[in-house]
């Protein structure tokens, strides 16, 4: 298992540390480190502290903050920035931009699992500027060009 440096900024995380929910889980659950419940009305967004700071340090890694599927499907709670990207040299607290795209007021409870953190490999590339590409089967075919279903 790859290891990264982490600071637990909220003392409650000592009893609820970031963890994988199962052996096959890709994401670590992030908790809402709030002092009191927050009401999120339809269409509103708010920044929720995770109580966690990470430093990936390795430029070959990045972390993504992703929504929890149940919150999105059942309550319309997704991320305000859709995907949060954390660079390897960032060392600050991880915040979650929470957006209520549902029709009902949603209450974010203190220490509720609000999002998930997935660490992924990153390949930094350089560009070769060209006038033309070598021909491929797809060419410039864009949206819908490979079929309907």
From Swiss-Prot:
Transmembrane segments: none annotated. One of its GO terms (molecular function) is dUTP diphosphatase activity. Its EC number is 3.6.1.23. Its cofactor is Mg(2+). The keyword Secreted does not apply. Substrate binds at residues 68-70, 81, 85-87. It catalyses: dUTP + H2O = dUMP + diphosphate + H(+). Pathway: Pyrimidine metabolism; dUMP biosynthesis; dUMP from dCTP (dUTP route): step 2/2. It comes from the Bacteria. GO terms for biological process: dUMP biosynthetic process; dUTP catabolic process. InterPro entries: dUTPase, dUTPase-like, dUTPase-like_sf, dUTPase_trimeric. It holds the Pfam family dUTPase. Keywords: Hydrolase, Magnesium, Metal-binding, Nucleotide metabolism. Belongs to the dUTPase family. This enzyme is involved in nucleotide metabolism: it produces dUMP, the immediate precursor of thymidine nucleotides and it decreases the intracellular concentration of dUTP so that uracil cannot be incorporated into DNA. HAMAP family: dUTPase_bact (MF_00116). NCBIfam families: dut (TIGR00576), PRK00601.1 (NF001862). This is Deoxyuridine 5'-triphosphate nucleotidohydrolase. The lineage of its organism: Bacteria, Pseudomonadati, Pseudomonadota, Betaproteobacteria, Rhodocyclales. The gene is dut.
């Amino acid at each position: 298992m790859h290891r990264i440096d982490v600071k637990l900024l909220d003392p409650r995380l000592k009893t609820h540390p970031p963890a994988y929910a199962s052996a096959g889980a890709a994401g670590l659950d992030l908790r809402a480190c709030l002092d009191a419940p927050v009401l999120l009305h339809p269409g509103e967004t708010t920044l929720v502290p995770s109580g966690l700071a990470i430093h990936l340090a390795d430029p070959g890694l990045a972390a993504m903050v992703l929504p929890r599927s149940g919150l999105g499907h059942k309550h319309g709670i997704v991320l305000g920035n859709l995907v949060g990207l954390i660079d390897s040299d960032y060392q600050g607290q991880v915040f979650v931009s929470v957006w209520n795209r549902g029709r009902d007021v949603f209450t974010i409870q203190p220490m509720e699992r609000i999002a998930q953190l997935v660490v992924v490999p990153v390949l930094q590339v350089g560009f070769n500027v060209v006038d033309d590409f070598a021909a491929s089967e797809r060419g410039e075919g864009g949206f819908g060009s490979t079929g309907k279903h």
